[in-house]
Amino acid sequence: MSELLKITLPDGSVREVAPGSTPADIAAAIGPGLAKAALAAKVDGELVDLTRPFTADAQLALVTAKDEAEALDLARHDYAHVLAEAVQALFPGTQITFGPSTDDGFYYDFAPKDRPFTDEDLPAIEAEMRKIIAANKPLRREVWSREQLISRWKQQGESFKAEWAAELPENEELTVYWSGDDWLDMCRGPHLPSTGKLDPNAFKLTRVSGAYWRGDQKNAMLSRVYGTGWLNKKQLDAHLTRLEEAAKRDHRKLGNEMDLFHLQQEAHGSVFWHPKGYLIWRELEAYMRRAIDGAGYREVKTPQVMDARQWEQSGHWGKYRENMFVIPDEVPNVDDEGPIVSNDADWMALKPMNCPAHVLIFRQGIKSYRELPLRLYENGCCHRNEPHGALHGLMRVRQFTQDDAHIFCREDQIVSEVQAFCELADRIYKHFGFTYSIKLALRPEKRFGTEEMWDKAERELRDAVVRAGLATEEYGWEELPGEGAFYAPKLEWHLTDAIGRTWQVGTIQSDRVLPERLDASYIGEDGEKHRPVMLHRAIFGSYERFIGILIEHFAGRLPVWLAPVQAVVATIVSDADDYARDALAKLKAAGIRADTDLRNEKINYKVREHSLQKVPYLLVVGKREAEEGTVAIRILGEQHQKVMPLDEAIALLKGEATAPDLRA
């Protein structure tokens, strides 16, 4: 008789079971309620199916809907599989590829037999998914050999799956999941016990888009079907409400209504800033300059185009070449027939980042340890060759400007420099009214440098956050294994906006690799050469994306100091035109960005129009206001108005129109 296995539960109690028993067996032994509620299990910390047999003593925690993070991920994963099964039932001959869960749902990529899918197909697919859920089909895991898997996929005409399976290691354990006895997919799992564990009213298919197989535009174009999935209808409804609110706040929509910027096909991924939008940019740029000047940074400007050999030396060519705009260093490089590239031409690249150029500035002249830290700042314009399908308004562009800085310092200065940056970022984000969380992204699997170097770099960032008093639950402190850059760990700032979304913006990274690769050095107190440590840091991330976040966070109602037009003097009657012009002159003299609206239109029409433009203050004047030297102030979003002397109104506006760092 086999020796019983000891399974330890979260409360410390131990259950003895026979080898081959499963978490589902233990759930049933505890009680029918738990057996029904259990969705999956954590065995020694690993999330597994309820039917996975025990082979040794283990720690067991049963996962139910109360474990929301795990339960949601399981549900979304299963919704993706049900989606694939439904599509193949409705559209025979469609090939399946892959479909992961996402932050708020799932998607699956398909190769349709006859035509690409469209949004019009979604209702029918949803209905078929609900049939599969209602059938309560058991989800069963099996381990297959690579040959068995390839044979199956070829037999079914699944060329994409067969291609993928053929590249898997021969000795890797490969798993498939059956849905009932008539449909299967290749998947690592885990999954829910059956399709009936999904709520048929807690998902919605949202859209269809194109996607290239393996993300390579040289490959076949697939149809990607997106969906959102939740544990119950209440969660789904709340999410859809958030989506509706997000649509109202969409920076592309508001940017058009407010006449801030536009994008067009002739310059994919590059922004055409209109006067009002560029004014916001200039205000942010001036604000950031004051902040970095006060923190001891020195502003620089570096070239847009550099020799490919520089990028090879820095390591970016090998890691990042596919995302760089590369051009031949040859004149002429184009004629009537098209591009000219000779075998003798060198290659140049538009910079995708500023860091190598800042190292080249540091290397000019001999540096002493007394000159460190040296903080170099640049509003650096960069270019990255992002796929067309990945571009999204201001949030994902090809040309962008970073509030980029690099701090060259000694080993003994790292913690204090990172701490100072943490405190600077804290002040800046609070000026914009954001709450945020801080994450420490730890070493990735593929990386430069030694283990000792990474140990030290991670410890320094952690210590700096602790010293700044930010490594607390209040600031959402969290460590993220595997999320660091290939050359350094990093701290990340995740802003929370008005509707609860998070945006990763600021970063700081300690880097010992690039100074080594580009031969940066300083003379130490001992008279010998030493390598500086390079701290890469940004607060806005990019001006484009930060402006997009601000527009959506404030729903276009920007703080008065950032509003392109801060006040409009609108007349009720033409008799007040001269008074309106005098009021405008006084507003401008006080440094307030103002305009007049003297059109022969009803005041309600003017109010509505300037509200759409998100003008913070409307100063309404008629014959009475002109005689008394007053204005009727109407604040954006409020129904009532308040009458006050013009001078008082100007004083009020001047206070709010002043940037927060300049207020007394």
UniProtKB/Swiss-Prot annotation:
Please identify the protein, giving its name as recorded: Threonine--tRNA ligase
According to the record's subunit comment, the protein's assembly and interactions are: Homodimer.
Role according to the record: Catalyzes the attachment of threonine to tRNA(Thr) in a two-step reaction: L-threonine is first activated by ATP to form Thr-AMP and then transferred to the acceptor end of tRNA(Thr). Also edits incorrectly charged L-seryl-tRNA(Thr).
Report the SMART domains cross-referenced here.
Answer: tRNA_SAD
Q: Where does Zn(2+) bind?
A: 355, 406, 536
Task: Report residue spans for region: Catalytic.
Answer: 250-559
Family annotation (CDD domains) = TGS_ThrRS, ThrRS_anticodon, ThrRS_core
Organism per entry: Novosphingobium aromaticivorans (strain ATCC 700278 / DSM 12444 / CCUG 56034 / CIP 105152 / NBRC 16084 / F199)
Residues of the signal sequence? Answer: none
Grouped into one coarse class, the protein's main location is cytoplasm
The alphabetized UniProt keywords are: Aminoacyl-tRNA synthetase, ATP-binding, Cytoplasm, Ligase, Metal-binding, Nucleotide-binding, Protein biosynthesis, RNA-binding, tRNA-binding, Zinc
PROSITE patterns assigned: AA_TRNA_LIGASE_II (PS50862), TGS (PS51880)
Q: Where is the TGS domain?
A: 1-64
- GO (cellular component) term, any one: cytosol
A GO BP term here is:
threonyl-tRNA aminoacylation
State the free-text cofactor note.
Binds 1 zinc ion per subunit.
A single GO molecular function term of this UniProt record: ATP binding
Give its localization. Cytoplasm
